Amino acid sequence: MAAMRSSREPRSDAARNHEALVRAATGAVHREGPRVPMATIAADAGVGIGTLYRHFPSREDLLDYLTHVSFEQVLDNAQAAERGATTAAEALRRFIEAAISQRNELVLPLHGGPPLRSPKTRAIREQIHQILRQIIDRGRADGTIRQNVTPREIVVFGAMLAQPRGPDPDWDMTCRRLLATYLAGLAVPTPP
């Protein structure tokens, strides 16, 4: 009987509750960290604690889910940046700008989220690093990216700029200026 239920589409109220829980949990983790009380998340979502535990049987399940969907989004960003850019520097700029614009939607280890436990999520992280390696290699080959740049450095810098915050146009502008400075620093220096 349970197998039949899992093959059907979720009821519309269950889907709405799931979406509300994910939004509330993301906001609560950004506000209070990964140890935020589960009751706070349920209250923020406007559902009872039982509904929360039906969707996510444990805190770890919830945090793993949030982290996994965040890494899926970052992977989508990396793929789009690689496809849509004509230069390596442009691809890196697009990748990091996407993270900045989504900063309040992502729950990642470098944003105070939990360490990665899921092999599937670790595999997505590796795909992201592989795409960034390809972008960096392209820039090395055409002489526009320094030889010593690593995917990890790109990810860490992007995560620093994409820290969750409330709306602040000045911060967005500051992030974009810092990004431009960073990308200029990645470039191979022109000889005197």
Briefly describe each language-model feature range:
Residues G33-P34, R54, R146:
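Helix-turn-helix/winged-helix DNA-binding modules
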Residues A20, T40, E90-A98, E153-F157, ...:
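Amphipathic alpha-helical interaction segments
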Residues M1-R5, R94, Q130-I145, P167-P192:
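C-terminal peripheral helix-coil segments that are non-catalytic and often amphipathic
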Residues V29, F56, L63-S70, L106:
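Alpha-helical DNA-contacting segments of helix-turn-helix folds
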